[in-house]
């Protein structure tokens, strides 16, 4: 069986500042909460995402940039994230929170391709999603950037969530 994030050092991964604790970080999700959230969202969350959220449920990483081959409205060669949504409902920036995945689809018009997992510094004008279009609701989704300012242009960032986390770089 594959070990999630084998060899990856999370020692200095998270920036547990006041804002992160207030808006993003929740207690580790129970299996029951995970099942409830998956049912509400209509998608099976990737094992690597669940594993990471059981270690640290949401938050702001120190490394917030992911390189891209094509320019975005944010930069010529990368996207930036503000934080990673945790599994839950109680924090505004959690999967089923006040500003969670369904809110971004319903209120901001993001395409229904999967689950919003990261917000970006643009305050809603671009987001990071788990993209289930190719794999279906129970498969292993890709991680994509969706740019609202460019007619919801979708750019693939990583083949899976673990590769996305491993690819984050310092600004």
PLM ranges: what are they?
Residues 1-122:
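A surface-exposed partner-binding patch
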Residues 119-121, 134, 147-150:
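Short, flexible loop/turn elements at secondary-structure junctions
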Residues 125-128, 153-154:
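Short active-site-adjacent structural elements
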Residues 128-136:
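Low-complexity, glycine/alanine/valine/leucine- and proline-rich hydrophobic stretches
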Residues 139-147:
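Short aromatic-glycine-(Arg/Gly/Cys) micro-motifs in beta-strand/loop hairpins
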Residues 154-165, 169:
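Compact, glycine/acidic-enriched structural inserts
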């Amino acid at each position: 069986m594959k070990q999630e994030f084998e060899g990856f050092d999370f020692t200095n991964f998270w920036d547990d500042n006041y804002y992160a604790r207030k808006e993003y970080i929740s207690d580790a999700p129970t299996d029951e909460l995970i099942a409830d959230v998956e049912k509400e969202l209509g998608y099976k969350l990737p094992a690597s995402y669940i594993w990471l959220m059981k270690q640290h449920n949401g938050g702001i990483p120190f490394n917030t940039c992911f390189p891209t081959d094509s320019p975005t409205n944010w930069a010529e060669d990368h996207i930036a994230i503000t934080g990673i949504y945790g599994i839950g409902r109680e924090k505004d920036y959690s999967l089923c929170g006040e500003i969670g995945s369904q809110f971004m689809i319903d209120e901001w018009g993001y395409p229904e391709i999967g689950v919003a997992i990261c917000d970006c510094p643009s305050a809603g004008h671009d987001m990071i999603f788990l993209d289930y279009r190719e794999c279906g609701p129970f498969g292993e989704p890709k991680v994509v950037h969706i740019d609202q300012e460019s007619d919801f242009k979708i750019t693939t960032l990583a083949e899976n969530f673990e590769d996305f986390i491993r690819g984050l770089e310092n600004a």
